């Protein structure tokens, strides 16, 4: 069973993603705290991380968390898809530089999300 970690400060966004991915039979683990992501990845061992760029009132941001994951031997091989409401070329470039496998713009539809995950994980 595929496991996806959803890290987003929006309860609503996490719920939408959970419903979408659960409909595929995938296991979903969640956090609204960016600082908790590295430990979640080490313990839950997800196949993929969906990581928001901006966490209101929190430091680090999603870019920092992605860099942390990619810099740690235990978590570097877990693919990350960054999620953002901002369509700025600089953000897309920073996500790639941080090691993200993809950058998905909010709002996105269920099919777009599922296809992005399947593409990154090379699933049919």
Where are these regions (language model features)?
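Active-site beta3 strand of CheY-like receiver
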Residues: 44-55
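Short, glycine/charged-rich "phosphate-handling" switch motifs in NTP-dependent
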Residues: 101
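C-terminal output helix
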Residues: 108-117
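Short hydrophobic/Thr-rich beta-strand motif most characteristic of the beta2 strand and flanking loop
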Residues: 25-34, 40, 104
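Short amphipathic alpha-helix used as the core "switch/output" element in two-component signaling
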Residues: 39, 61-76
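His-Asp phosphorelay/catalytic-motif detector in bacterial-type signaling
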Residues: 45-47, 74-79
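Charged docking surfaces used in two-component/phosphorelay signaling
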Residues: 15-23
């Amino acid at each position: 069973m595929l496991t996806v970690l959803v890290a987003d400060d929006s309860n609503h966004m996490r719920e939408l993603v959970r419903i979408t991915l659960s409909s595929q039979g995938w296991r979903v683990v969640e956090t609204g705290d960016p600082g908790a992501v590295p430990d979640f990845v080490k313990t839950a061992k997800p196949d993929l991380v969906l990581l928001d760029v901006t966490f209101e009132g929190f430091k680090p941001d999603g870019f920092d968390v992605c860099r942390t994951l990619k810099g740690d031997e235990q978590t570097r091989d877990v693919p990350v898809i960054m999620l953002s409401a901002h369509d700025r070329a600089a953000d897309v470039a920073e996500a790639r530089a941080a090691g993200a496998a993809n950058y998905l713009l909010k709002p996105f539809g269920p099919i777009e999300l599922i296809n992005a995950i399947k593409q990154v994980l090379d699933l049919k």
